[in-house]
């Protein structure tokens, strides 16, 4: 950085501190990842200067020749990755993408069936504190109490009873494969629209490691970060018949000017996602998650649903004498970043929780593999078994720093 230290030393110091945290801490938050230098460069480019309300070839401002090219490239790439008929890459976030779909198919008060947030869903799938729960009449399906997996017969029975206008599938904390074909059959049976929020698994879907929702859903939304390893942002895929309505819902419906520098960064991430290396990376994410899950089970931890099929796992801490909130704090003090997370049928409030969510995308980006995952699982166990012992946390923190030195993120490129 050449100019920031002089112009704004406070922000410069905060950024440098965050760089250090990312380099020397173990990032296990399932929704986080490390973008490439190319993505960072695109997002920090002069495209941030350009206003471009509208769509390529139909802008409300002049001077859009080059940003049109950028957006066209991004749209074509993401359509190619997922085999979609239409794509909108303008949503600023996954929440905005979901809002746009809701605005297309729903009126205030319409019935929607989505996954319970407490069972692994997402705020925008009908939480009463979110716009989705305030505007629409959401009902919820969850996981089976015994298997802790989605029971599709129960979903079908709920759908038959409620006759929702829209069914939403997708999750933020569900460690198993989701059967989108079954959901589509349920939606068809009750005459509902079907939307999938694949934000967490978009990278796995791109690599063919999770069944794609695109052939089955009327609408698919996603973020571009998480497993897709792009900038923070969103996109929508849909059938051609909904293309005009979706585009109108995004602009002028819920957004004004698109963030062209972010769309450029999305395009770069999409190109990276089309490479053979990306597929291998996604395979390793899953291998790493399975290795860590197996090691945690060996160490005596109960995982929700008994394991994982994807990039994340939920650890039930109820028999360990520690809450999710306490675990998150203790691990952070030892240089390991996770997030407290509700488990299905959690007796604790969402601000405390009985579990933690662990994900492997970011550490896999660093080049870590199964052996490192097993080692990290043991470090997690050491901290959680002694979460009030400052000496243990300090010891683990040093071990974490030594491990991080072997797998640099951006230091090797400086």
UniProtKB/Swiss-Prot annotation:
Chain residues that bind (6S)-5,6,7,8-tetrahydrofolate: 117, 121-123
GO CC annotations on file: cytoplasm; cytosol
Listed SUPFAM superfamilies: PLP-dependent transferases
Site residues (Plays an important role in substrate specificity), renumbered to this chain: 225
InterPro entries for this protein: PyrdxlP-dep_Trfase (IPR015424), PyrdxlP-dep_Trfase_major (IPR015421), PyrdxlP-dep_Trfase_small (IPR015422), Ser_HO-MeTrfase (IPR001085), Ser_HO-MeTrfase-like (IPR049943), Ser_HO-MeTrfase_PLP_BS (IPR019798), SHMT-like_dom (IPR039429)
Major localization listed first in the record, in broad terms: cytoplasm
Top-tier EC class: transferase
Cofactor: pyridoxal 5'-phosphate
Presence of keyword Transcription regulation: no
GO BP annotations listed: glycine biosynthetic process from serine; tetrahydrofolate interconversion; tetrahydrofolate metabolic process
Pathway in which the depicted protein is active: One-carbon metabolism; tetrahydrofolate interconversion; Amino-acid biosynthesis; glycine biosynthesis; glycine from L-serine: step 1/1
Domain of life from the UniProt record: Bacteria
Keywords from the UniProt entry: Amino-acid biosynthesis, Cytoplasm, One-carbon metabolism, Pyridoxal phosphate, Transferase
Residues annotated with N6-(pyridoxal phosphate)lysine modification: 226
Subcellular location: Cytoplasm
Catalytic reactions of this protein: (6R)-5,10-methylene-5,6,7,8-tetrahydrofolate + glycine + H2O = (6S)-5,6,7,8-tetrahydrofolate + L-serine
EC annotation from Swiss-Prot or TrEMBL: 2.1.2.1
Pfam families (UniProt xref): SHMT
GO molecular function: glycine hydroxymethyltransferase activity; pyridoxal phosphate binding
NCBIfam families referenced in this protein's UniProt entry, alphabetically: PRK00011.1
Role: Catalyzes the reversible interconversion of serine and glycine with tetrahydrofolate (THF) serving as the one-carbon carrier. This reaction serves as the major source of one-carbon groups required for the biosynthesis of purines, thymidylate, methionine, and other important biomolecules. Also exhibits THF-independent aldolase activity toward beta-hydroxyamino acids, producing glycine and aldehydes, via a retro-aldol mechanism.
Subunit structure: Homodimer.
Similarity section: Belongs to the SHMT family.
Protein name: Serine hydroxymethyltransferase
Organism for this UniProt entry: Dictyoglomus turgidum (strain DSM 6724 / Z-1310)
Gene that specifies this protein: glyA
